[in-house]
């Protein structure tokens, strides 16, 4: 789906996202993946649940994503890679506070195919995730590019010691 959004909508949404939105990249441990980690990329807008109607309207207007409730707040979530790339490509020029995060997420998405094949490229992409976390003032992060580096080094050592 390559929806083209109108400029007025993108301008409004960029201001809204700069205030109440998040552009998130995470490294999650996952033993079933080649490098024992997966990357998670998310565009999120949070509102009090009493204003969930606004988030439901975003789902309709953006055409992808979903709304989840977390107690007194609700979140609009977009994490499907192709629609996320399409959406952020159009939104990015209008962002002010979150433009660096959008640029880094777009860069990550564009490098995903090679990052899935090369441990060095995967590690490089993980450093971009670290940069996004720093821009977002992330407080609860457990897995960083250094965590991934240690796992990749361990995997490399196992390969070397195997006959």
Swiss-Prot record:
Effect the entry attributes to changing residue 143 to G: Reduced affinity for DNA. No effect on catalytic activity. Reduced cleavage
Originating organism: Chlamydomonas reinhardtii (Chlamydomonas smithii)
Compartments where located: Plastid, Chloroplast
Positions with a binding annotation for Mg(2+) 2: 20
GO BP terms, alphabetized: intron homing
Residues binding Mg(2+) 1: 19-20
Keywords, comma-separated and alphabetical: Chloroplast, Endonuclease, Hydrolase, Intron homing, Magnesium, Metal-binding, Nuclease, Plastid
SUPFAM superfamilies: Homing endonucleases
Protein name: DNA endonuclease I-CreI
Function: Endonuclease involved in group I intron homing. Recognizes and cleaves a 19-24 bp palindromic DNA site.
Positions of region (Interaction with DNA): 26-38, 44-47, 68-70, 138-143
Cofactor note: Binds 3 Mg(2+) ions per homodimer. The enzyme can also utilize Mn(2+) or Co(2+), but has lower cleavage activity with Ni(2+) or Zn(2+). Ca(2+) Co(2+) give no enzyme activity.
Alphabetical list of InterPro entries matching this protein: Homing_endonucl, LAGLIDADG_dom
């Amino acid at each position: 789906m390559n929806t083209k959004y109108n400029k007025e909508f993108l301008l409004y949404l960029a201001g809204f996202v700069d205030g109440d939105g998040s552009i998130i990249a995470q490294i999650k441990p996952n033993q079933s993946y080649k490098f024992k980690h997966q990357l998670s990329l998310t565009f999120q807008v949070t509102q009090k649940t009493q204003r969930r109607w606004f988030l439901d309207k975003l789902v309709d207007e953006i055409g992808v994503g979903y709304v989840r409730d977390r107690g007194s707040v609700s979140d609009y979530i977009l994490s499907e890679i192709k629609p996320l790339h399409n959406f952020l490509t159009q939104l990015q020029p209008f962002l002010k506070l979150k433009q660096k995060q959008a640029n880094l997420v777009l860069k990550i998405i564009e490098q995903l195919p090679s990052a899935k094949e090369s441990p060095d490229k995967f590690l490089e992409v993980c450093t971009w995730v670290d940069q996004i976390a720093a821009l977002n003032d992330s407080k609860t992060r457990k897995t960083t590019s250094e965590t991934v580096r240690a796992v990749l080094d361990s995997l490399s050592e196992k390969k070397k010691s195997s006959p």
